[in-house]
Amino acid sequence: MIALIQRVSQAKVDVNGETIGKIGKGLLVLLGVEKEDNREKADKLAEKVLNYRIFSDENDKMNLNVQQAQGELLIVSQFTLAADTQKGLRPSFSKGAPPALANELYEYFIQKCAGKLPVSTGQFAADMQVSLTNDGPVTFWLNV
């Protein structure tokens, strides 16, 4: 399971021209689910996202997690994170989870995070437009 997290000052996701998820300061989490993923991996990744210390403390050191920084999460499914790009000039999605499993684990991941802080989401399998202001820029690839 993969999360590409970006520290943002704001982010939103639109579907068919309508904003369906929006946050202020926090993390945009682009979530990719692979074939071998399960709830145990989702638990581990949620804990890592919630506790990853990438927000500045009073000394301007990356020492606070999103909860301590009183931030929010915008969680968006992105199957392309599971792409195999090692061969050729076209990505292969053979590592990606089937849609039913991917949706189940995406929803489970959201539930794990929603109990801890405000969460907005995208729409699974939709064509979405995501806009953000990356604060830093600060971006990390988390893989469990």
Curated annotation (Swiss-Prot):
Q: Which reactions fall under this protein's catalytic activity?
A: glycyl-tRNA(Ala) + H2O = tRNA(Ala) + glycine + H(+); a D-aminoacyl-tRNA + H2O = a tRNA + a D-alpha-amino acid + H(+)
Q: Which GO cellular component term is one of those annotated?
A: cytoplasm
Gene Ontology biological process terms, A to Z: D-amino acid catabolic process
Which domain of life does this protein belong to? Bacteria
Q: Spell out the coiled coil positions from the record.
A: none
EC number of this enzyme:
3.1.1.96
Where is it located? Answer: Cytoplasm
Q: What GO annotations for molecular function exist for this entry?
A: D-tyrosyl-tRNA(Tyr) deacylase activity; Gly-tRNA(Ala) deacylase activity; Ser(Gly)-tRNA(Ala) hydrolase activity; tRNA binding
Q: Which UniProt keywords apply?
A: Cytoplasm, Hydrolase, RNA-binding, tRNA-binding
Motif Gly-cisPro motif, important for rejection of L-amino acids, residue range(s) on this chain: 136-137
Provide the top EC class.
hydrolase
The primary site where this protein sits is cytoplasm
What does the similarity note say? Belongs to the DTD family.
Q: Give the PANTHER family listed for this entry.
A: D-AMINOACYL-TRNA DEACYLASE 1, D-TYROSYL-TRNA TYR DEACYLASE
Self-association or partners: how does it assemble?
Homodimer.
Q: What does its UniProt record remark on the domains?
A: A Gly-cisPro motif from one monomer fits into the active site of the other monomer to allow specific chiral rejection of L-amino acids.
- UniProt function note: An aminoacyl-tRNA editing enzyme that deacylates mischarged D-aminoacyl-tRNAs. Also deacylates mischarged glycyl-tRNA(Ala), protecting cells against glycine mischarging by AlaRS. Acts via tRNA-based rather than protein-based catalysis; rejects L-amino acids rather than detecting D-amino acids in the active site. By recycling D-aminoacyl-tRNA to D-amino acids and free tRNA molecules, this enzyme counteracts the toxicity associated with the formation of D-aminoacyl-tRNA entities in vivo and helps enforce protein L-homochirality.
What name has this protein been given in UniProt?
D-aminoacyl-tRNA deacylase
Q: Which organism is it from?
A: Haemophilus influenzae (strain PittEE)
